[in-house]
């Protein structure tokens, strides 16, 4: 790469105010991102950076060098969207109210302070992490072997039971022996379906397309009375938890707005349970089912071992589990999309050496899975699932922007600003995921309804098919 390379203008289309194309592109972007980005890249001659309009006018970043540049910029250079938004997706009023989605920080509207507050809450509960993880996991398998899967035969629905029990006990103390019971699982699943439809709606930046979007969502019916009732069940459980008075006091002392604080916690605990844990178990289960020889090796490594957050952090003791975990993070990172607005004119590098002009006010969309399949960094097999990829090559982990940032100079900091996943910032998310993976490998035999599909074009950033499900799950003998 050289600073002497010609500076190029991103090619592609940003559509006029009367065009319906932004609405159509948003639908394809959200439902079949692999197909959408493949078509966009081909349309723009294979360029790693190009204009697109999936509901919003964006400049798309798709290779490793540009992604690394993106994640290393402080909020004085690239800052988060205003409001409760993730690109064209907007949090619904019924779900989040006036609360802040404190997952990806910015300097605007106190997002940064809200995320710092969530980090402080997790640190308050850090000592309870291992005990609550073991309690929730033991109960999950005890119930599974006693009662079977019941109606919850998709991988997501099954493991959301384990993750919701853990997260709600860890953060709020719900489900502890002799304490406040967990809210009904059916209410949690209703509020946190795999497609996140209760949480988000679509808001497009061109008037005609946005009108069509609003009509389509109105026809679909919005948040149902059943969903509203389940939301209230979860909010009441949060407000009644033993930790709530302490969390309220901490927030008041922080100077942050307290309006809809309960909804902010519902959002955070729901996202951690669903996208950070249950979805990752889809990737774990599907990848292991597609790689039976590796599964046998992993079982040999894990059988008879006590798995705790501390023990699984030892990559030398559990090299296969560690490498498997990082390969999951590489191909299936979360969140998949990041939207940032340029605070000044910028020049973006790429893996090919080409450089692209970005101007103040441009919105950049960095697609997390695409930057992790760049052959310039991960080799000719970058699109393949290789669970031993990181064994003997631990430095390659620095090129996986786990939980939204490269390896930081200090925990949770890149360029002096907070970034990425709060649970990772406090140092436990890697361990939690490894325990989830490892206990499943130790405990279960399973058969899938359909063969898992690992194809970063057809199923970009996920394991296919949609609704990946079990035909049978039994305890190991």
Swiss-Prot record:
GO terms for biological process: fatty acid biosynthetic process; oxylipin biosynthetic process; sterol metabolic process. It is an enzyme of class 4 (lyase). GO terms for molecular function: heme binding; iron ion binding; lyase activity; monooxygenase activity; oxidoreductase activity, acting on paired donors, with incorporation or reduction of molecular oxygen. This is Epoxyalcohol synthase CYP5164B1. The keyword Signal does not apply. Pfam families: p450. Pathway: Lipid metabolism; oxylipin biosynthesis. Its cofactor is heme. InterPro entries: Cyt_P450 (IPR001128), Cyt_P450_sf (IPR036396). Cytochrome P450 epoxyalcohol synthase involved in the metabolism of oxylipins 'ectocarpins' natural products, such as hybridalactone, ecklonilactones and derivatives. Isomerizes the hydroperoxides into epoxyalcohols via epoxyallylic radical. Its EC number is 4.2.1.-. PANTHER family: ALLENE OXIDE SYNTHASE, CHLOROPLASTIC, CYTOCHROME P450 26. It catalyses: (9S)-hydroperoxy-(10E,12Z)-octadecadienoate = (11S)-hydroxy-(9S,10S)-epoxy-(12Z)-octadecenoate; (13S)-hydroperoxy-(9Z,11E)-octadecadienoate = 11-hydroxy-12,13-epoxy-(9Z)-octadecenoate. Gene3D superfamilies: Cytochrome P450. It comes from Ectocarpus siliculosus (Brown alga).
